[in-house]
Amino acid sequence: ITAGVCDQIRQSVGYGNTNVKICASHAGITLGEDGATHQTMEDIGLMRMLPGMTVINPCDYNQTKAATIAVAEHQGPVYLRFGRPSVPNFTPVDQKVEIGKALKLIEGTDVTIFATGHLVWEAIQAAQTLQQEGIYVELINIHTIKPLDEKAVIESVAKTGAVVCAEEHLIAGGLGELVAGLLARNCPAPVEFVSVDDQFGQSGTPAELMKLYGLDSESIVKSVKKVLSRK
């Protein structure tokens, strides 16, 4: 998906609330060597601002397949986002996607990580590292960004009191801003963002760019420690 088609989506899909499913491949910075002109890091923000648009960002092959089935059965416009990089297939093969319902992957008490897309895998690795240091992460897989599972977000943060949001997207318009706004209204807590801060991408391998832009598991670990210092 490029910005050039956003007006068509707004006028022909969003405004009419038509039953159209938009499947966007190669989203985010990990498109890699194609560089900034091909790396879409603002798409979630653009799509979730459209009234009535459902936005889904699955984390692996199994969840993508389940999300595709759920989307086909859903009435109304949907934006389904796919990444390019290969990630381990860690979700159960028979696990269904319920649109608007987050999945708790790890139970914890110290900090909540809300992750979406393939950064869920990075968050799993970060949680394992942190557990070895005595920090217990609650990891929530936010496959549906809109409608956000507000109940799951508030309940988790009320328990842990600290938040890290991880996504392959700009801070502006992304999951992190959405979560922070919800918490400001209902359950104030310190929040750190593992996302891209107001800049375009560049050419490089996916792994190089993940590290350069602070989206890898090591960056999530650092953000967790930073937010814990603010509790």
Placement of each model-derived feature along the sequence:
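Conserved thiamine diphosphate
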Residues: I1-T112
